[in-house]
Amino acid sequence: MTRFGDGSRTGIRIAWSQEDEPLETAGGIAQARTLLGIEPFLLVNADIWCDYEFSTLRGFDLGARLSHLVLVPNPPQHPAGDFTLAGGFVGNAPSPRYTYAGIAVISPQLVAGVTAGSKAQLAPLWRAAAGRGAVTGELYEGHWNDVGTPERLAALSTRLKEP
């Protein structure tokens, strides 16, 4: 928080929501509800590396949908994937499945039933919303890596240094 402050030095706006204990992503969003407002927002996991063109999501119109997910082909550490994708809609069918890339546009309504301060994951909310046809998605097949472990981060770092 000290390093980035409110983001004004870099031309962005950062608002911090304090968690006394980790609340998972949906719980954290519910905790920050007053900071986020009522408009859809971009959610990006801190432990991914990619060359996805984020500007394509600026002003993304969810319409009546609750989320738009970016999915990727399943990486070796997650071969079963998370969701299906058919006709631009995310689903829960057994196959073919893709992995959530850690990039989404989310309506705050997705977490409307989550109490501020409570621990809650996004995946169950997305599965329920996808079952109602309320989640769209896209498949991204560019450069993407989950760097959520020291080993995966080191492997990517080594690969990026190669000529």
Predicted regions: what they are:
Residues 68-82:
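Short beta-strand-to-loop element that shapes/binds the nucleotide-sugar donor at the catalytic cleft/hinge
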Residues 38, 64-65:
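Short, high-confidence coil segments that cap the C-terminus of an alpha-helix
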